[in-house]
């Protein structure tokens, strides 16, 4: 559930950023709203990511290292979302 919500936040941020960029010359006020929403979605993503990190840290403290499969999945998911977040941040930051 948490991973799906993180993906949803990034997807929303990407969509809002694209709308902002598309509309910035046509309707600046609406574009500004979309840019603000994109930043808010990125903030939501960051809060969820912080919770995922907390959960994983607590798991390691209580149970020791994760299984190899779980660690691989965690690393893959982290890399995927970090790359996606970087892409979305570029979109958001390109809006001026």
Please name every model-derived segment:
Residues 1-96:
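Non-heme di-metal
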